[in-house]
Regions:
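Preference for short coil/turn "hinge" residues that link or interrupt alpha-helices
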Residues: 13-15, 20, 44, 63, ...
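Flexible beta-edge/linker motif
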Residues: 20, 25-144, 157, 164-199, ...
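Juxtamembrane regions of bacterial inner-membrane/periplasmic proteins
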Residues: 72, 121-133, 152-159, 163, ...
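Extracellular/lumenal and peripheral-membrane lipid-interaction modules
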Residues: 1-23, 215
């Protein structure tokens, strides 16, 4: 009776706040640490059923209960159904994006407490780890998303947890397509550790559902693994470290590239530090894509509702060919198959303080040592040394192709153009053309400051060199890949 009274009080508050109807057929406590629940349903007002649960039996850690902490040691559940439906503009989950019906009023004498990120995330992770049992079995889990006549369904016939290790098969149904995945891993409450691996049950790649219909994108991979360990020093400082690996990754979206982007091997070994008002990706973090390895540093700090972002990468001397042979296929078409020798080093810094945008720092420096292009790849980068063919585009469509050189009747050599006209073009487009190496970091910095101030892309910082490269070598598709190549 006491258990039902406590549960009813909490569910009643949730019902009033979010406009839900929460019902159960049976709720009882067996002994001091076992709960049995039957016939649970959650139905938003005037909407389709969101969640149903046939039955579940949960065993709690008795000694943790004495310290007012919840830790699940065993769980058994059957027929769990989570269904997201949307018909036209009406969805059974839109309550998640609405303001609560009852908002506690604040008196003028009250002060607003700032969000403590480390404390909030620590509480959330402790809650999640507490609900992850050491042993259990979940049968027939259905997660479905349905919009009009389209749907995606994930079915877990059986999710088994034994001595902290779990495994499951997953059936994916998307409209007329069916796929089969496997998942396994390990979770340890005592060590605050989670490890998981996802891969296909057959020889095909794992294809992420829903995103093709929703975003026009396609993502596939061979295997994906992830691990995370939580540590805390109890002084508003939280540490998350772990690894993420992906093999055989293919990504397609027209905004990224007109071709499929392929990555053979990607690895992230991360160390994240979270304080009461900041997030930091430590410089000990390692990112590996194919053969190249970098150690990025990221920091986001909030002060008086304004953010301060810092990003930095310092890569000491390394063989130049490691970079060019590691570039993902489909992202740098003009550099594919290029062969180089020598060494490169790179430094990058971006520091944006939204409280003082004029203090923005942008540094990017690529150093070379005995660098040479041994063999051109798919694109002859030296073609401007002689006559070449150019295609003019308008609104993404080719309108005219002609040679740039003496064979074209309208070709005019540079020494035949008035020096005054030459100087006028340079001063209006790129006054330091003869004094830089293709980039003007200060121009890019000033353009970025202005764009952030007006909150739109209003000014560019391209030099004549960058515009020349864009027009001669790059395609006319306005996407992320073209900007990276430029």
């Amino acid at each position: 009776v006491l258990l039902r009274s406590i549960v009813n009080r909490h569910t009643s508050r949730i019902e009033q706040t979010h406009g839900l109807c929460i019902h159960y057929d049976k709720l009882e406590m067996n002994g001091l640490n076992e709960i049995y629940l039957q016939g649970l349903s959650v139905i938003p007002e005037q909407r389709d059923t969101l969640f149903t649960l046939a039955s579940t039996r949960i065993k709690l850690n008795f000694w943790k209960l004495l310290t007012k902490k919840i830790e699940v040691s065993y769980i058994a559940a059957e027929d769990i159904r989570l269904t997201f439906t949307k018909q036209d503009s009406i969805a059974n989950y839109d309550f998640l994006f609405k303001k609560d019906r009852k908002v506690p009023s604040q008196t003028s004498g009250q002060t607003v407490t700032e969000i403590n990120y480390s404390e909030r995330i620590n509480k959330l992770l402790n809650l999640c780890y507490g609900f992850l049992p050491e042993n259990g079995q979940l049968k027939q889990i259905y997660i479905t998303e349905r919009k009009d006549s389209n749907f995606v369904s994930m079915v877990f016939p059986s999710f088994i947890i034994k001595e902290n290790k779990f495994r499951s098969t997953i059936e994916i149904h998307e409209d007329t397509l069916t796929r089969h995945w496997k998942a396994d891993g390990e979770l340890k409450q005592s060590a605050n550790t989670l490890m998981a691996k996802l891969y296909s049950a057959d020889s095909t790649k794992v294809s992420i559902p829903y995103i093709t219909r929703r975003f026009g994108a396609k993502v596939t991979f061979d295997t994906l693994s992830y691990s995370m360990t939580k540590e805390s020093n109890g002084k508003n400082q939280l540490y998350l470290n772990g690894k993420a690996k992906v093999n055989g990754l293919d990504i397609f979206h027209k905004v990224l590239s007109p071709e499929v982007i392929h990555l053979d091997r990607g690895h992230l070994g991360y160390q994240m530090n979270i304080s009461d008002h900041s997030f930091e990706l430590d410089s000990t973090t390692t990112v590996i894509f194919n053969k190249i390895q970098v150690h990025p540093y990221l920091r986001a700090e909030k002060k008086k509702d304004l953010w301060h972002f810092t990003a930095a990468v310092d890569k000491s001397w390394f063989p130049a060919d490691e970079l060019f042979s590691s570039l993902p296929k489909g992202l740098f078409n003009n550099l594919e198959s290029i062969k180089t020798s020598g060494e490169l080093a790179y430094h990058f810094l971006l520091d944006i303080d939204f409280a003082q945008l004029d203090s923005l720092k942008l540094e990017s420096e690529l150093k070379e040592r005995n660098f040479e292009i041994v063999e051109y790849g798919d694109t002859q980068l030296s073609k401007m040394s002689g006559e070449f063919v150019y295609t003019a585009y308008e609104n993404g469509m080719p309108v005219r192709t002609f040679p740039v050189g003496p064979s074209w009747e309208h070709f005019t050599p540079l020494d035949s153009i008035s020096p005054i006209l030459q100087m006028s073009v340079m001063q209006s487009e790129d006054g330091a053309f003869y004094y830089h190496h293709g980039f003007l970091p200060d121009a890019l910095r000033e353009a970025l400051i202005y764009d952030l101030q007006v909150k739109r892309f209003a000014r560019g910082g391209s030099t004549i060199t960058m515009q020349l490269v864009k027009n001669v070598f790059l395609n006319k598709n306005k996407n992320f890949a073209r900007k990276l190549e430029e």
